[in-house]
């Protein structure tokens, strides 16, 4: 088992270096299927691989949606039809990636997690990928994805509050993404601000106890929390429609 694990982790690292992210996630899926608790490095390889696979498609979807709106405003019906078909292809790819990692999380990664940090990490990841599903879904499908995302984030919060310091980068990253979920998916800027402010204030109160190893990661996420708070507070005051900055952790945080 160890030889297989080492082999797949090595292949995943090679795939990352060569930016072959589809192969990276396949290698890490094989590690997950061994049903062992992943190391911090292995967790991050899973996260980075899927983040890149999904990230490119999320960017494509946003661009297509923007172009589609412009074509609709111009009354270019034929182009709108083409765009809808193209967007549907991207949405099918997005759904496939999300459902793939969500299955791995439910069947292997969460059941194999004994450490609090691992449990929080993978429930947060579950919340993230249901959130990505909710981004492009509508009607009952969107509600189902949003409900599943909310439950996963809540499970992550419950575990984090019992076992991780407020300054821990995994707990801070959870607060960042959960607050974005409230803002973008549930359209609740008040809840988003409340969650982000609480996480930021709790971390500030314990900043002196922050260890050197995670100082850079933690302060980076705290900065993103503060940036979002500034933007969202401005939106609340001015009833603006500006989009969220720093909606997720930077890639090197995953």
UniProtKB/Swiss-Prot annotation:
GO CC terms, sorted? cytosol; mitochondrion; nucleus; plasmodesma
InterPro entries with a match to the protein in the record? 14-3-3 (IPR000308), 14-3-3_CS (IPR023409), 14-3-3_dom_sf (IPR036815), 14-3-3_domain (IPR023410)
**Could you mention a single GO BP entry for this protein?**
brassinosteroid mediated signaling pathway
Q: Which top-level group of life is the source organism from?
A: Eukaryota
List Phosphoserine occurrences by residue: 65, 188
The UniProt entry's sequence similarity note says: Belongs to the 14-3-3 family.
Q: What is annotated about its quaternary structure and interactions?
A: Interacts with DREB1A and DREB1B in the nucleus. Interacts with CINV1.
Question: Which PANTHER family does the entry mention?
Answer: 14-3-3 PROTEIN (PTHR18860)
What's the name of the protein?
Answer: 14-3-3-like protein GF14 epsilon
